[in-house]
UniProtKB/Swiss-Prot annotation:
<dbReference type="InterPro" id="IPR023011">
    <property type="entry name" value="ATP_synth_F0_asu_AS"/>
</dbReference>
<dbReference type="InterPro" id="IPR045082">
    <property type="entry name" value="ATP_syn_F0_a_bact/chloroplast"/>
</dbReference>
<keyword id="KW-0812">Transmembrane</keyword>
<keyword id="KW-0472">Membrane</keyword>
<feature type="transmembrane region" description="Helical">
    <location>
        <begin position="225"/>
        <end position="245"/>
    </location>
</feature>
<feature type="transmembrane region" description="Helical">
    <location>
        <begin position="187"/>
        <end position="207"/>
    </location>
</feature>
<keyword id="KW-0813">Transport</keyword>
<feature type="transmembrane region" description="Helical">
    <location>
        <begin position="96"/>
        <end position="116"/>
    </location>
</feature>
<feature type="transmembrane region" description="Helical">
    <location>
        <begin position="259"/>
        <end position="279"/>
    </location>
</feature>
<feature type="transmembrane region" description="Helical">
    <location>
        <begin position="139"/>
        <end position="161"/>
    </location>
</feature>
<comment type="similarity">
    <text>Belongs to the ATPase A chain family.</text>
</comment>
<dbReference type="GO" id="GO:0042777">
    <property type="term" value="P:proton motive force-driven plasma membrane ATP synthesis"/>
</dbReference>
<dbReference type="InterPro" id="IPR000568">
    <property type="entry name" value="ATP_synth_F0_asu"/>
</dbReference>
<protein>
    <recommendedName>
        <fullName>ATP synthase subunit a</fullName>
    </recommendedName>
</protein>
<dbReference type="GO" id="GO:0046933">
    <property type="term" value="F:proton-transporting ATP synthase activity, rotational mechanism"/>
</dbReference>
<keyword id="KW-0997">Cell inner membrane</keyword>
<comment type="subunit">
    <text>F-type ATPases have 2 components, CF(1) - the catalytic core - and CF(0) - the membrane proton channel. CF(1) has five subunits: alpha(3), beta(3), gamma(1), delta(1), epsilon(1). CF(0) has three main subunits: a(1), b(2) and c(9-12). The alpha and beta chains form an alternating ring which encloses part of the gamma chain. CF(1) is attached to CF(0) by a central stalk formed by the gamma and epsilon chains, while a peripheral stalk is formed by the delta and b chains.</text>
</comment>
């Protein structure tokens, strides 16, 4: 055996589990040439699973006593439909936005739920397949900022589309330079107010989009780190001869955090969907 072989330290373990399976190493904070294959593939697979679940529920829907899947989907449909009606008053737009909200909620929930998979399970399987235990793999797509910001940018694109569709190019352009401070009959003041209003609108769009993606990413990233620390506690317990405190602490901490995290992943999926509906509702309303 090689003399250099050794068990990873706690910091090495965490750093390894925070690395993505990428096409090229990332050297800059923002680098659009880098593709996180793990996040992309898992997000697409879970997106397909989302569509399969909803399609299956729709295909098996009946007027009689609903099954568990149909009952669960009906509850979600009613919840999303009520929120869509509260935020988007255009019935024609709701025909697309309400189903989209349902897909977003289920999709984000499934991506968040990957955090419930044991930390080392899928990376270990991937390492066995690749015959390299150091091969990185992250399994929570929403703990990747690229995923959450991509979703937030998609919502931003829809905001722009509905602003143009509902208000027209002229109406939206007028809104961009007249809200929130209004305008003036004086040409000079009107120009100054128009520039200030446009700047405020740009700041609002940027702030909404960044916070939309960062909120989901931050919560899921933190949850992932906590699970890693609990896993380290379990590893320390396995190697410790000092008593039962570490094993008991590992079990208690893991159980409590898992139960709490079920609430977190559900709440974060709901918040992300709600913000999407609110932002799309704003695109329909005059400022």
């Amino acid at each position: 055996m090689a003399a250099s072989a050794h068990a990873p330290t706690a910091s090495e373990y965490i750093v390894h589990h925070l690395q993505h399976l990428q096409n090229v190493p990332q050297t800059k904070i923002v680098d659009f040439s880098v593709v996180n294959y793990d996040s992309m593939v898992l997000a697409l697979l879970l997106g397909g699973l989302t569509l399969l679940i909803l399609w299956t529920a729709a295909r098996k829907a009946s007027c009689g006593v609903p099954g568990r899947l149909q009952a669960a989907v009906e509850i979600l449909v009613e919840m999303v439909d009520n929120q869509a009606k509260a935020n988007i008053h255009n019935a024609e737009s709701r025909k697309f936005i309400a189903p989209l909200g349902l897909v977003v909620f289920v999709w984000v929930f499934l991506m968040n739920a990957m955090d419930m998979v044991p930390v080392d399970l899928l990376p270990s399987i991937w390492g066995q397949i690749r015959q390299d235990s150091h091969e990185p793999l992250r399994v929570v797509p929403t703990a990747d900022l690229s995923t959450t910001m991509g979703l937030a940018l998609a919502v931003l694109g829809l905001r722009f589309w509905y602003s143009l569709k509902i208000k027209g190019a002229g109406g939206w352009a007028h809104e961009l330079v007249s809200a929130p401070f209004g305008t003036s009959k004086n040409p000079l003041f009107a120009l100054i107010l128009g520039l200030v209003n446009l700047l405020m609108q740009v700041i609002e769009y940027v702030a909404n989009t960044v916070s939309h993606g960062m909120r989901l990413f931050g919560n899921m990233y933190a949850g992932e780190l906590v699970f890693m620390l609990i896993a380290l506690m379990g590893g320390a317990a396995a190697l410790s001869l000092s008593g039962v405190l570490l094993p008991v602490g590992h079990v208690i901490a893991g159980t409590l955090w898992t139960l709490f995290h079920i609430l977190v992943i559900t709440l974060q999926a709901f918040i992300f969907m709600m913000l999407a509906l609110i932002y799309l509702g704003q695109a329909h309303n005059a400022h």
